[in-house]
Amino acid sequence: MKENPLASRSDVHIFPDSSRVVALLFVAGQELGGAESRASSVVKRIVALPEADVRRRLKDIIQRFARRHRDIVAIFSQHAERVSNRLDPKADLSEERWLLLGASFTHEYSLEAAAVCNPSIVMHPDQSDVPEGAVRFVMSYRGVGEGHRSSIGFRTGLVGADGEITLDPREPYPMIGTARDGLFHRDVFHARLKAMGQDGESAAYVLDELPVVFSIEELEARLEILISEFDTRQDAHTIARHHRSIAACSYGVHFDEGVDISERVLWPVMSAEAHGMEDARFVLFTEADGTTTYLATYTAFDGLNISQQLLRTDDFISFDASPVVGAAAPRKGLALFPRRINGKYAALTRYDSETNAVCFSDTLGHWGRAVTFQLPEWDWEVIQLGNCGSPIETEAGWLVLTHAVGPMRTYSLGAVLLDLDDPTKMLAALKEPLLIASPEEQDGYVPNVVYTCGAIAHGDILVIPYGVADHRINFATASISALLKAMTTTEHPAIVAKVQHRRLEDLALEH
């Protein structure tokens, strides 16, 4: 398949850097999970070491690792505190022995040992001191490390007036943010409980007395009342357990302002994402009153099951995560529109795993049925379709980058145009891929894949960071006006009829 002249590749590339490491808690015996800890045995051995050996070993460790972390001594102390309950209360440890104890419960994790891929991009919240005609951006990306565990990292840079892309240098010390309790949304609880078959009288007894958005303290107060009435509500303990499991999916993360954005790492906090946070799709969302915030959906993976989560941030310093549920959000790939449409939130979805659709909601946490607007049509998309991030608003309509999978499991990027007022209507589409892996891009962790989780418009320039073979990141640009001009309405009458039939079915179910 020929390269599409609409897309121009940049010479800017991002490769995985195995030296990007964080120091994590390590507990012997629990490396693979499910096994019993050997922590007590390790503690006893540390306590029994001669003081001279302790000093010598600690000195060597600090010499080797201090340059790799901003404050390795503080990390050792934190990890020692985590296992201090295994110490004899009468034990009087020297500072050196305390730090060696912490070091024995610490290991390095290389965030990008396997890959960097699947980026999304938004305008930076700080556009001060930017050269004339340029804009500053924030790019999120998926880092894949040992055990194929994924995290979310960030890069910043500039797009010049001519579309030239420049990346800012990265600071050397990746940092995981501090987790805190999150806020909960009542509609999300109802939706999750309904899916479990547990949204009955007792659930209503808890939730109906809570505000639309509530805290963990407010939830626990209601659950205590429920449990106190277990003699008349025999499912009280079960309902309380379900509420707490849902609450565990909402949390906050905060970074110190002194930590550069290129050092901030969103790392799994809850059990539902223990094996990774994948494919964040960020968008700068604007309300009707002009206020803005950054939103993103991402896929939480526990090693077996996947679910969708929502991120919110105003500044990329503090983040709030909460679950996303509903018929239109069963697996992955929800991408939010950058504003409300007819008073409702809107999102792209691939709820059936192979077609593109739009859904609407009064809230960001619960999405009902979706309306299909695109079925696989061309030979390069016969296996499945999906979106590549949030739509971009143009005068002609919503510009949507899509991905398609064709023969030889080849991933390519396409584009469609949706109606501004009714995005369930597809106005036009590219007949050929906008971007497909070049010969130089075919090889990698997953061959023949190009994929993005979002693009931005800078004037008439469409800026597309994209993952290559699930291993590295490249950039491409395209003229938006030329892209729109190259689109055509679908030419297959049978496909047109199928889409219209599917759309009418979806609309009937919606109402």
Go through each PLM region and give its residues.
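Beta-rich carbohydrate-recognition and catalytic domains
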Residues: 1-275, 284-334, 339-383, 393-445, ...
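Short glycine-rich loop/turn motifs
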Residues: 278-279, 307-308, 388
